[in-house]
């Protein structure tokens, strides 16, 4: 559940989803409601918001045919926000719901933010981040508390993106463990005790960036998806 309210209009949102969270949203269901008067461009605005929120969470890479995101406006407030006002409010709501979905993902013990910096394009940044988010070896390493930057590089290298495999920097929870694709700081100084794990990958081929949220791969995820008959 997420809410936005000022003295002119209000936006509220709800979402359901614990597994199969991946573009195109998989089995996730979300409804966002506002009392604002929506502009003719509401669909376009909401698509941009979804592309940068719901479509940038990726729990397990599995998709389905049953995803839905709805934006509903009653116009009851009588206030018509500007496009930028509306987009900002929707980003707040959908961003919060996206983070909550990943935090509540099946079997999750860690929320993982994978930030790509200095990519050739935003789409390349998304591709590299998503390749890491869907890499089971990397997700298992995070579950085990292993700051294995080699798995980060290996995952990044599978992406269909412009990169130089010899010049990539990697930070794990703020510790630069890899510079120009070679060891840097002692990886044992990386602390994975907190719920949030931050992976920063600097491709050094441009100035675009993007972040994907995912989670680790645990025993509980395997159990929850195997201990029943469909």
Predicted regions and their residues:
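A structural signal for small-residue-enriched, beta-sheet-centric alpha/beta enzyme cores
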Residues: 1-230
């Amino acid at each position: 559940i997420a809410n936005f309210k000022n003295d002119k209009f209000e936006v509220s949102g709800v979402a359901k989803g614990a597994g199969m969270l991946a573009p195109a949203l998989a089995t996730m269901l979300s409804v966002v409601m506002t009392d604002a008067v929506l502009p003719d461009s509401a669909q376009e605005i909401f698509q941009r918001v979804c592309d940068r929120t719901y479509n940038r969470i990726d729990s397990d890479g599995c998709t389905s045919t049953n995803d839905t995101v709805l934006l509903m406006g009653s116009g009851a407030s009588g206030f018509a926000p500007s496009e930028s006002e509306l987009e900002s409010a929707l980003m707040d709501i959908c961003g919060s719901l996206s983070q909550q979905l990943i935090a509540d993902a099946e079997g999750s013990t860690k929320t993982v933010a994978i930030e790509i910096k200095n990519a050739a394009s935003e789409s390349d940044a998304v591709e590299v981040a998503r390749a890491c988010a869907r890499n089971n070896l990397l997700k298992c390493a995070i579950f085990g508390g292993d700051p294995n930057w080699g798995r980060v590089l290996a995952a990044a290298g599978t992406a269909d993106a412009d990169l130089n495999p010899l010049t990539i920097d990697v930070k794990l929870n703020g510790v630069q463990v890899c510079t120009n694709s070679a060891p840097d700081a002692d990886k044992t100084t990386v602390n994975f005790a907190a719920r949030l794990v931050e992976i920063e990958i600097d491709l050094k081929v441009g100035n675009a960036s993007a972040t994907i949220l995912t989670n680790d791969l645990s025993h509980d995820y395997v159990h929850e998806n195997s201990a029943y008959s469909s």
